[in-house]
A protein has these predicted regions:
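Extended substrate-binding grooves/exosites of carbohydrate-active enzymes
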Residues: 1-246
């Protein structure tokens, strides 16, 4: 999956649409020889329910993808709930953060089933899901948006169980592998950082959630004691959680 840099804001200015089309064409022509690319993404979280110009723009970009590379699939990452076939695309994937920005992680599985019921027989993609955490932030139990390792791990436990049990979810993309710079953010342990990574930005520290996925995805025998950086603790007795594939 490689994606055109159209995110959030859509302008009704015709020059905006022209520039988007040019960028999609350039993206494909510059990268079409990469065998790893299966999907061309035409945007991310575009304001399809707020801006009238968004729908015709995305339909036009989907046509450009089909003209430039009819042998690969077109897609979009969205948090607006579009269904399979939107804008003439070959696929649609969703960015969902239930349990982080709002609601609880337990609402994710019912949401998947509702989307499936709206578009029976069609696959659903998950292009983003995640929760933030700092390796020096701890709470037992963690709570939504506290940026604790404990809550991030719990969030991913709930999400992965839901995704594992639904094979019709065609892609499952964690946001994100590494913490990354994000100038507009002021949250968690450091300003200017999106801390939803499973690993710190310097690639040196793997968070607890990393080992949750390792226990589920890797056949190499492993055991990992979580919350190992949670010292000192404020209670005399504490619960110990272990990830293992043994």
């Amino acid at each position: 999956w490689t994606e055109h840099a159209l995110i959030n804001t859509v302008s009704p200015n015709p020059r905006f649409a022209e520039r988007c089309a040019t960028q999609v064409i350039e993206l494909i022509r510059q990268n079409f020889n990469h065998p790893s690319i299966v999907f061309w993404g035409i945007g991310n979280d575009c304001q399809t329910q707020r801006v009238a110009a968004a729908k015709p723009l995305l339909e036009m970009l989907a046509r450009e993808v089909r003209l430039e590379d009819p042998d690969r699939l077109s897609t979009i990452a969205t948090n607006y709930g579009e269904l399979f076939g939107a804008y003439g695309l070959d696929s649609v994937a969703h960015n969902k953060y239930q349990g982080w920005y709002s609601a609880t992680p337990d609402e994710f599985a019912p949401w998947l089933d509702t989307q499936r019921a709206k578009s029976p027989g069609q696959s659903i993609g998950m292009s983003e899901f995640g929760a933030g955490a700092g390796v020096n932030t701890h709470r037992a139990p963690g709570v939504r948006m506290d940026h604790s390792e404990e809550y991030q791990a719990y969030y991913h436990e709930v999400y992965w169980r839901a995704l594992r049990d639904r094979p019709w979810v065609w892609c499952k993309a964690i946001w994100q592998m590494f913490d990354a710079a994000s100038a507009g953010r002021n949250e968690g342990e450091l300003p200017g950082i999106n801390d939803k990574g499973l690993v710190t930005r310097d690639r040196l520290t793997r968070k607890d959630a990393f080992y949750w996925y390792k226990a589920n995805w890797n056949d190499e025998p492993m055991v990992y004691v979580t919350s190992r950086r949670f010292t000192p603790r404020s209670v005399a007795q504490t619960e110990i959680k272990i990830y293992s594939n043994c």
